[in-house]
Amino acid sequence: MSRPTHVTSGPYAPPAPARELTAVSADGARLHVEVHGPADATVPTVVLAHGWTCSTAFWAAQIRDLAADHRVIAYDQRGHGRSPASDACGTDALADDLEAVLAATLRPGEKAVLVGHSMGGMTLMAAATRPRFREHAVAALLCSTGSSRLVAEARVLPLPAGRLRTGITKRVLGSRAPLGPITPVARAILKYATMGPGSSPGMVEACARIVHACPRAVRHAWSQVLDLLDLDHGVRELTVPTAVVAGTADRLTPLAHARALVATLPNCVGLTELTGLGHMTPVEAPDVVTGRIRELVADYAQIKEGA
């Protein structure tokens, strides 16, 4: 049976890109990249980095809106979507891959607003000191992410914080078991773990298609990276104006992570707390997330490009 990929109709169906290309990372890993929107060099550019077990399809709502008047670049993290898997998994690889995408898609000195969800946000933290990041990033948006203690603070299991919950959570998130077909039970589990209780069936279906399409070996390999994650130093190096978005019902990266980011970021320009929403904020609140991106572009990218 073929693996489900993404929904093909409705607001969460991925739009066709204007151009596709392959970026080659430092270790030779090949990354699938999509470019959406006008080719006009005067329009602002936004770069989207998705999270663990997701793909470019996760950004469908943002791409559809922003591509009307922005150049939008989205790429599949290694092993996800149409980017082949690699033996190298780690925060250095995430940073290398983002640098490769920036080099392949942006002109020298071109500025862009960089947006990361979950592991995509961690990618921005990991790359904060890299030369290409500093050359191109004019502002950043971190959605539903954290910099350390991810497993210890996750609330996927209804248990009190402590060694027991941490140990079981580690085994659950790091499981090598296949997710299987998308059934009503599978949808209910995914909704409970990753989305707010008010998420619509269409939102849940879109996320289920994307997550279930991630190969289990890739899911397991990157879960080990997230388990050991420590990017607190990267947050302190993220000096561009940075906004944070988080759901108050996020079980994977609870609100405490967002508040810690706000307290640590050198140049935080706001925290948006979305009441009752879970981990999949770009899908659960597409208008809010897209609106924050547009605000960052208006406040920073257009000023820089016109200077």
Please annotate each region the language model reported.
Residues 29, 64, 73, 77-119, ...:
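Active-site loop/oxyanion-hole signature of alpha/beta-hydrolase fold enzymes
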Residues 51-54, 118-119, 146:
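Active-site glycine-rich loops that stabilize anionic/oxyanionic intermediates
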Residues 252, 271-291:
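Catalytic histidine-centered segment of alpha/beta-hydrolase-like enzymes
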Residues 251-257:
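Conserved alpha/beta-hydrolase "acid-adjacent" motif
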Residues 238, 244-246, 250:
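Short beta-strand/loop motif that positions the catalytic acidic residue
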Residues 148, 175-236:
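Conserved alpha/beta-hydrolase catalytic His-Asp/Glu region
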Residues 29-85, 104:
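Conserved HGGG/HGGXW glycine-rich cap/lid loop of the alpha/beta-hydrolase fold
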Residues 129-173:
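Flexible "cap/lid" loop of the alpha/beta hydrolase fold
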